[in-house]
Amino acid sequence: MAPPVKGKRKQSEEGEPLDPPVSPQPDGEPRSRSPVRLEEPPEAGREREEEQEEEQAFLVSLYKFMKERHTPIERVPHLGFKQINLWKIYKAVEKLGAYELVTGRRLWKNVYDELGGSPGSTSAATCTRRHYERLVLPYVRHLKGEDDKPLPPSKPRKQYKMAKEPRGDDGATERPKKVKEEKRVDQLMPAKTKTDAPDPARLPSQETPRDGMEQRGPAAGPSLPFLGASGCPEAYKRLLSSFYCRGTHGIMSPLAKKKLLAQVSKAEALQCQEEGCRHGAGGEPQAPPAAPPLESPQSPGGPAEDSRHRLTPLEGRQAPGGGLWGETQAGPRPSAPVVTGCFHAYPSEVLKPISQRPRDLFPSLKDRVLLGPPAKEEGLPAKEPPLVWGGDAGRPSAFHKGSSRKGSLYPKPKACWVSPMTKVPAESPVPLPTFPSSPGLGHKRSLAEDSSVHGSKKLRAVSPFLKEANAQECGTKPRGPDLAVSCLLGPALPEAYRGTLLRCPLNFAGTLGPLKGQATLPFSPLVIPAFPAHLLATTAPSPMTAGLMHLPPASFDSALCHRLCPASSPWHVPPATAYTAPHFSFHLNTKL
């Protein structure tokens, strides 16, 4: 152990002279540099001391001035995650050329970089400028002997935003602009009132030909208020367009646009009120008389029929026929007055326009047996006061085109267009056309079918549904004394009158259910003969005409559920009758 120690000492002793030549180089450098370092600190220290003294004096005077100004600096804000050094920001701005130059050249981001803020900040320049303006700028202007003048515009790059002005000039700059805008609106408003003033006077003369072309009726009165009301939006659009054209504002800020629109809307509201008063004075007195002309031609029965429009749902459905008859008298007319004047909609029913004239031709029918409405209407009141039906038999209705006579007395599900049937050639043995019908309607028979079975021998053993129809419709549905169901409408008919009951749907309301969603087919003139009113009236002493229903030539909605076949015998004139009584053969369960 000892020898190696001695050896190490020897090596260290021998190595001692070798160390100095190696060590002087690193030692010499610090020795040569040390005098420089020792010389610099006094100068840097003096500068630092001077800067610190100047900074302290600046901060003391700054705080004192701001306190005297009644805007004391209570807390120095942070900028870029660092507290702002007011001395540094002051020196940086002075180095770049004072506040006005930095603002004009947009160098506030450079000031922020010198303060050592984070480089990724997007609002660095704006925040730096605001802090400088609030904390340092008043004192800097005090040092330079400048007055505390208002600040320059905050965002000179975006000058189109007129509403946002510097804080000091907000009130002073916006007031003249508002005055100018109000002057423009005032200049435009008299012009618009001058141009719009003669409009109410022109409306009756100019717009009546248009209404005459469109309506051809007495409905020109109510159109005036609508035209007057629509005049205001047009004037508003014209005013806005002319305002923007004459204003020449260029690009406007949203706030300025809102202010402009508010001013224009106020002025236009006043104008619209004035125009409304004028239109109300000119057009509204004409509107109330226009309502009676719309209802008067549509209700030929007079006040008695108008009062019946609102008695019961059943009677309400019977009312529209009168209105439809009146519609053809006054000429074509818009659909809105017709709907509001006549039709009464019920939630569970289909709107059914009808013709009511058979009551006029056969007054004895109201004392006879009437077939009632379908089963779903059993709960409805069944009172039927005597009707006052107006009109003559020669006037067609809107729904029965070309027919010289109205249809049945009872409600039908739909209205369909029917070709004329009044004039049937006496020598026409042409077979009847066949109509397609859905197989699902086979078991839905009307009472006309059953009554025709009782009246004619050919139909007795044909249909397999006769017992079912008799049991359901004839035997099990009593509806009261006035609406008693009967399969035979009178005594047994002589042979000459059997053809008169052919396929006549005596209970049209019975077919409401199956025919609600289906289209109806028009009849050919050869299907059912239309007996003139005077011929049937001449046979009134006979028991048959008192119990017969009038054969309606109009649209038979029960046509879809009937199976019609060609006629088996031509028309002939029996010796005992004064009019033709056709005989038809029907095969009821034939599927077409």
Curated annotation (Swiss-Prot):
Sequence ranges assigned to domain ARID in this UniProt record: 52-144
Cellular-component GO terms for this entry: nucleus
InterPro entries in alphabetical order: ARID/SWI1_ChromRemod (IPR051232), ARID_dom (IPR001606), ARID_dom_sf (IPR036431)
Keyword annotations of the record: Activator, DNA-binding, Immunity, Innate immunity, Isopeptide bond, Nucleus, Phosphoprotein, Repressor, RNA-binding, Transcription, Transcription regulation, Ubl conjugation
Gene3D superfamilies: ARID DNA-binding domain (1.10.150.60)
Glycyl lysine isopeptide (Lys-Gly) (interchain with G-Cter in ubiquitin) crosslink location in chain: K82, K91
GO molecular function: mRNA 3'-UTR AU-rich region binding; transcription cis-regulatory region binding
PROSITE patterns in the record: ARID
Key word Protein transport present: no
Domain of life: Eukaryota
Biased composition (Basic and acidic residues): 28-49, 162-186
Posttranslational mods: Phosphorylated by MAPK14 on serine residues involving a TLR4 signaling pathway upon lipopolysaccharide (LPS) stimulation leading to its ubiquitination and proteasomal degradation. Ubiquitinated leading to proteasomal degradation; involving WWP1 linked to MAPK14-mediated phosphorylation upon LPS stimulation.
Role, per record: DNA-binding protein that may regulate transcription and act as a repressor by binding to AT-rich stretches in the promoter region of target genes. May act as repressor and down-regulate enhancer-dependent gene expressison. May positively regulate chondrocyte-specific transcription such as of COL2A1 in collaboration with SOX9 and positively regulate histone H3 acetylation at chondrocyte-specific genes. May stimulate early-stage chondrocyte differentiation and inhibit later stage differention.
Protein name: AT-rich interactive domain-containing protein 5A
Gene symbol of the encoding locus: ARID5A
